[in-house]
């Protein structure tokens, strides 16, 4: 059927990329499902929803997985790991990291490493950076987190605040190693980008 066709096309994409020395990163969401999906008891409801909680609230009213439940966590880890087993995906970009327990991330990383010892994950820990990442770096969870500080630092640099940026980079670089990395970005679908900040700032 159409699902098999999509799977075949996805496999062809990965195979052709690998033939050309290109690695494939896939975005995954473990915290929640899409609107109008039915995962039964895996989804938080009623008193299970804790308003204002990073990990037990329903983000934007999306169906929130009860990741604190070991059975739910294990199923989510199994699903994500199966993608790597089936298709040979190289990396994951992990959405909404702060909204899932650290134990789940450690379990996912362990499971993925059993499939591919070189597998890497970069996490989106909203608002985080090298000094603030919910202990997801250097702990066997994420290999890297997106650096939310970098956007501001790039803006500061262009505005001439070079010494403060140099100080930031020196501090950041002193803690980075192969289990504690940051991924730089200048904008995303969740926040204003570098260009918008500069234009709105009159530059």
Predicted segments with their positions:
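Substrate-binding/active-site clefts of carbohydrate-active enzymes
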Residues: 1-3, 7-87, 107-116, 120-123, ...
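Active-site-proximal helices and loops of the catalytic beta/alpha 8
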Residues: 14, 18-22, 78-81, 85-91, ...
